[in-house]
Amino acid sequence: MVAVRGSHLLNPQDFVIEQWCSSLKLPTATEKSLIDAWYYAQAKIAEHADKMENAVLTLQSGVEMVEILHEMNMDSESLLTAMLFPLVANQLVDWEQIQEDFGPKITKLLKGVEEMDNIRQLNASHSANASQVDNVRRMLLAMVDDFRCVIIKLAERITFLRDAENHFCEEEKVLAAKECSNIYAPLANRL
């Protein structure tokens, strides 16, 4: 099923994190942690403005991942991890900061999602046979301690594909689609 996410259509200047969190009807503690993470992300992006190509896209990616995971009834730790993952992916925070600011559980989830990114070493443009790709998928599932990492990574890939439509050249779009088709779509099917 394909759905258009509300956050995907928002004008970033008009986005109000408190209203958005309220619209999700989350428990108060989860809502507060997401709001705090949003402002944390904004501060980290501002600190690294010189190396950020598209700060708005980074923030929107976290919001959209949270929406996807919320629809899947994922827990508050998963939602918080999703909000923070774009910071990790863009290397705007280090592990000590995450550990100090969000604790060991969130740090472990973020590391698990980041480890799944190692799969990109198998370039979609290389002609891998079906058994090689299947072995890679099995390796992905085996290397994570927490299944939530896989779900969060799948949400991240969905947002990645949506962003690719507007920000990639045709060749990059094809490579992104092949990667998701070969690795992540069958992985999602297995779950």
Which functions belong to the PLM regions below?
Residues 1-191:
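Active-site helical microenvironments for divalent-metal-assisted chemistry
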